[in-house]
């Protein structure tokens, strides 16, 4: 690799010290490197960490400084470029980032001599329908989450798989995740840890009001449809403003969201796009899990 683009979480590297350190190292080795924070100074751009319009067409690798969240946001926003990503963690080593600032030189040396592997991660497409109209669509690397929006009550919904009714749930919400997302919100909700390159779709209810409702794993090419129902199980117990607050929300990777109402259908399928992560670290996925225990 010779052509690099650096995306920086400005909250974790506010002065750009780490960004400049990486850029200087790459340039000293004869590589070409463009930093988004330098572009922002030139074009006075603010907002999200990454902007697909600013990425040069000859970029071979996007280096993301921050944490797992920054890497997820960059992979979503730059997915149309089909460029591999590598994460440099500023803080505690996560599940997705490959290295940190203490060992970045060794990692970049591996990239420069083409000594690396590519992990291909499945993504999800989600569409929200109100009647026959599609009102919202987005993609997710980790998960699509449907839960309550403020009110302290459970929500009711039906789940269909490939058009076949699965079950009716009363819960705080539901998480539809990829294998990559199995170590995110789904794990906190009691879901299993899954090898991240596995191709599948996992459905995990959030605090279900039943003892026998657990995570279910489906094939990658299955279609998951969630239909929102009236919150009958909780409406009788609610009074005042909470009773009138029926807002529920669908969130994609914690980044974008859309409020949903009774009758809305959220259809989730495997995306045609994938995220490609560069892997140079000798730390295996199992070792990362072991270090978290």
UniProtKB/Swiss-Prot annotation:
GO terms for cellular component: cytoplasm. Its EC number is 2.7.1.23. It is found in: Cytoplasm. It comes from the Bacteria. Its cofactor is a divalent metal cation. The active site is at residue 68. InterPro entries: ATP-NAD_kinase_N (IPR017438), ATP-NAD_kinase_PpnK-typ_C (IPR017437), NAD/diacylglycerol_kinase_sf (IPR016064), NADK (IPR002504). Its main location: cytoplasm. The keyword Transmembrane does not apply. This is NAD kinase. It comes from Lachnospira eligens (strain ATCC 27750 / DSM 3376 / VPI C15-48 / C15-B4). The lineage of its organism: Bacteria, Bacillati, Bacillota, Clostridia, Lachnospirales.
């Amino acid at each position: 690799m010779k052509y690099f683009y650096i995306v920086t979480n400005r909250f974790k590297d506010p002065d750009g010290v780490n960004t400049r350190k990486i850029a200087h190292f790459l340039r000293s080795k004869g590589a070409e490197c463009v930093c988004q924070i330098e572009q922002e100074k030139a074009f006075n751009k603010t907002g999200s960490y990454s902007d697909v319009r600013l990425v040069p067409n000859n970029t071979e690798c996007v280096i993301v400084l921050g944490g797992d969240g920054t890497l997820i946001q960059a992979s979503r926003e730059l997915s149309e470029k089909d460029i591999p990503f590598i994460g440099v963690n500023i803080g505690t080593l996560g599940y997705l980032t490959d290295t940190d600032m203490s060992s970045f030189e060794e990692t970049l040396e591996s990239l420069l001599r083409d000594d690396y592997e590519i992990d291909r991660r499945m993504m999800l497409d989600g569409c929200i329908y109100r009647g026959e109209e599609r009102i919202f669509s987005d993609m997710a690397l980790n998960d699509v989450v449907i839960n309550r929006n403020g009110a302290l009550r459970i929500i009711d919904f039906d789940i269909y798989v490939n058009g076949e009714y699965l079950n009716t749930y009363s819960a705080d919400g539901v998480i539809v995740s990829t294998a990559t997302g199995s170590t995110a919100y789904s794990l906190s909700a009691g879901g299993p840890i899954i090898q991240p390159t596995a191709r599948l779709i996992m459905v995990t209810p959030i605090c279900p009001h039943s003892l026998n409702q657990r995570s279910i794993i489906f094939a990658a090419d299955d279609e998951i449809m969630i239909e929102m129902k009236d919150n009958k199980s909780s409406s009788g117990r609610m009074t005042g403003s909470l009773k009138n607050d029926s807002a529920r929300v669908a969130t994609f990777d914690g980044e974008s969201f859309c409020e949903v109402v009774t009758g809305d259908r959220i259809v989730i399928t495997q995306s045609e796009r994938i995220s490609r992560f560069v892997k140079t670290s000798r730390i295996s996925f199992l070792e990362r899990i072991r270090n978290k225990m």
